[in-house]
């Protein structure tokens, strides 16, 4: 792990062990915003992962998104170092597909 990535990891871990407990562990997403940012930086580097984390933190609020939101496996199409906002997903979540989402449930089954 490079020095900048390691420094970011230590800073995030420090936040998780200190301030996060004082603020209250009430993130609306899983994984938490700090864990998401840490994983994004580990997977995509400090620049891209940092922007992904910032976008996630901006979405986490009373009128923002919630639920399962995983770090993308690949960088978004069109993302480049000179267009940092393109790394982040500013709306919506990256939820895994579930078999239940495909099923149609009949609320009143027949005889």
Curated annotation (Swiss-Prot):
A GO CC term attached to the entry: plasma membrane
Protein name: Putative membrane protein insertion efficiency factor
InterPro entries the UniProt entry points to: Membr_insert_effic_factor_YidD
Keywords (A to Z) from UniProt: Cell inner membrane, Cell membrane, Membrane
Stated role: Could be involved in insertion of integral membrane proteins into the membrane.
Pfam families for this protein: YidD (PF01809)
Family: Belongs to the UPF0161 family.
Membrane topology according to the record: Peripheral membrane protein
Top-rank taxon: Bacteria
